[in-house]
UniProtKB/Swiss-Prot annotation:
Keywords, comma-separated and alphabetical: Ubl conjugation pathway
Comp. bias regions, Pro residues: 10-26
Region: Disordered, residue numbers: 1-28
Transmembrane region(s): none
SMART domains: FBOX, SPRY
PROSITE patterns found in the cross-reference section: B302_SPRY, FBOX
Name of this chain's protein: F-box/SPRY domain-containing protein 1
InterPro entries tied to this protein: B30.2/SPRY (IPR001870), B30.2/SPRY_sf (IPR043136), ConA-like_dom_sf (IPR013320), F-box-like_dom_sf (IPR036047), F-box_dom (IPR001810), FBXO45-Fsn/SPSB_families (IPR050672), SPRY_dom (IPR003877), SPRY_FBXO45 (IPR035784)
SUPFAM superfamilies per record: Concanavalin A-like lectins/glucanases (SSF49899), F-box domain (SSF81383)
Species the sequence originates in: Xenopus laevis
Length: 280
C-alpha cells in the first residue's frame, strides 16, 4: 500500500542546468597567454599569419614588433632568407632579423624581369646571361606609392657600356634589343647610368649627375644608396656616406618600383631594401 502511495506522488521538478558562461572577448583571452608562450607559437608562423596576429590586440602587436631581434623574427629569417645571404656581407647594413625579413620581401622579382636574367638563390642578386645585343632588367617584388624608402645597389661584375639604376612603373619594359639605357628609355622609368653619369627619362638625357666637376666614376662593388621620397616626389642618391643630391623631381603619383638594367654578360647586380631612410 505504501509503495502505491509513493508511486502516485509526482517527483519534484528538476531545475534546468545553467547555460555555460560565454567565452571571454578575444582581447581578454589573448591576455592570458604568457609572453614566452606567445613568442613560441609565433615563431612557427609565416609572415601573412604574423601580420594577422598583429591585428588581434595591442599586446600581440607589442609582442611581435617590440623586439626586432626576437626569436619570432630570428626563426622566420632563418626559414626564408638564404644561408648565403645571412653568412656573407650582403645584408651587413641591416642590424635586425626583422629588417632582413623585410629586405627579402622587397627583393628583385624572379617573375618580373627579362628572360635573359635570373635571380640567384640568395634572393637579392641578379645574374645576366651572356646574350648578345640585349639590354635586360628587373623590378622588385613590391613598389611604393607613398612614404620614404631607401635601398642599396651595387655591381659585382663589369658594367659594360650601360649600367643603370633607378625606378620604374609596372608598365616599363624590362628587356629590349641592343645595348641601351633601358631605365629612362620611356616615360615609365627614371635612371642614372653609372657608366657616363647621365640621368635618363623619357628617352632623353636630363643632365649629368652628380652636378660637380670631374665626378668620380663608379667602382665595382661600391654601394649606391637610392632614396625615394613619395611625399616630395623626388629620387636622390648617396655614395658611401656622401649625399649626392636629388636627381629627379616631380615624380608621378603612381606605384614606383626599384629597378636595374644591365648589358654585360655574366655580370651581377645586388639590390637590398633598407627601409625608411635616416635623416641627416
Amino acid at each position: 500500500m505504501a509503495a502505491a502511495i509513493n508511486a502516485a506522488v509526482p517527483s519534484p521538478p528538476v531545475a534546468p542546468s545553467a547555460p555555460p558562461p560565454p567565452p571571454p572577448p578575444l582581447g581578454q583571452a589573448s591576455d592570458r597567454f604568457p609572453s614566452l608562450v606567445l613568442e613560441l607559437v609565433f615563431s612557427y608562423l609565416d609572415l601573412p599569419d604574423l601580420r594577422s596576429c598583429g591585428l588581434v590586440c595591442k599586446r600581440w602587436y607589442r609582442c611581435l614588433h617590440g623586439d626586432k631581434n626576437s626569436d619570432v623574427w630570428r626563426s622566420l629569417c632563418c626559414r626564408i632568407v638564404s644561408e648565403e645571404a645571412l653568412r656573407t656581407d650582403i645584408l651587413c647594413n641591416l642590424r635586425t632579423y626583422k629588417a632582413k625579413v623585410r629586405a627579402f620581401q622587397h627583393g628583385l622579382s624572379s617573375s618580373d624581369c627579362s628572360r635573359n636574367v635570373f635571380i640567384k638563390k640568395n634572393g637579392f642578386t641578379l645574374h645576366r646571361n651572356p646574350i648578345a645585343q640585349s639590354t635586360d632588367g628587373a623590378r622588385t617584388k613590391i613598389g611604393f606609392s607613398e612614404g620614404r624608402h631607401a635601398w642599396e645597389v651595387w655591381w659585382e661584375g663589369p658594367l659594360g657600356t650601360v649600367a643603370v639604376i633607378g625606378i620604374a612603373t609596372k608598365q616599363a619594359p624590362m628587356q629590349c634589343q641592343g645595348y641601351v639605357a633601358l631605365l629612362g628609355s620611356d616615360d615609365q622609368s627614371w635612371g642614372w647610368n653609372l657608366v657616363d653619369n647621365n640621368l635618363l627619362h623619357n628617352g632623353e638625357v636630363n643632365g649629368s649627375f652628380p652636378q660637380c666637376n670631374n665626378a668620380p666614376k663608379y667602382q665595382i662593388g661600391e654601394r649606391i644608396r637610392v632614396i625615394l621620397d613619395m611625399e616630395d616626389k623626388t629620387l636622390a642618391f648617396e655614395r658611401g656616406y656622401e649625399y649626392l643630391g636629388v636627381a629627379f623631381r616631380g615624380l608621378p603619383k603612381a606605384c614606383l618600383y626599384p629597378a636595374v638594367s644591365a648589358v654585360y654578360g655574366n655580370t651581377e647586380v645586388t639590390l637590398v631594401y633598407l627601409g625608411k631612410p635616416l635623416d641627416g
